[in-house]
Amino acid sequence: MSSTAGGEVSINSGDLLLGTLSTSITKLEQQIRATQLSQKKLNSDCETMAEYLRDLSEYKQPVDLLPYVGKLNDSTIRVNNTHQKLDDLLERLTKLQRQIARETYKKKNSIKEQEPPVQPEN
């Protein structure tokens, strides 16, 4: 950027481009550093979880899974109830479609059976 004697400020397009790129590059570097830090934390958490699982597998007493089995059974019951409701709904829709098809068939037949109006002769 340079200034002239008349108090005007002229902007060199190259300086403007470099300034914009440098800002973008700085933001990108910050995002990369933040990603690297989060990856390190994730790695640390994975190691902690693996250690916990190793400790858990060394226990002589089995893990109590009864609460989880109960929750799974409750979920299964809910899924089955939903499935039954959907089946009932599908059955009602099928009946409705059949009734509509019957009514449509009857209407078409009644229209076909009607005599066409006599057209005047020329």
From Swiss-Prot:
Molecular function GO terms recorded: SNARE binding
This protein's UniProt keywords: Coiled coil
Lineage: Eukaryota, Metazoa, Ecdysozoa, Nematoda, Chromadorea
One Pfam family this sequence matches: Snapin_Pallidin
GO cellular component, one term: synaptic vesicle
Keyword Transport found: no
Residues that span the membrane, as ranges: none
Subunit composition and interactions: Component of the biogenesis of lysosome-related organelles complex-1 (BLOC-1) composed at least of blos-1, blos-2, blos-4, dsbn-1, glo-2, mutd-1 and snpn-1. Interacts with dsbn-1.
Keyword Coiled coil recorded: yes
Biological process annotations from GO: endosomal transport; endosome to lysosome transport; intracellular protein transport; lysosome localization; lysosome organization; positive regulation of gut granule assembly; positive regulation of intracellular protein transport; synaptic vesicle exocytosis
Family per similarity comment: Belongs to the SNAPIN family.
Recorded superkingdom: Eukaryota
Coiled-coil stretches: 76-109
Stated name of the protein: SNAPIN protein homolog
Described purpose of this protein according to its UniProt entry: Component of the biogenesis of lysosome-related organelles complex-1 (BLOC-1) involved in gut granule biogenesis.
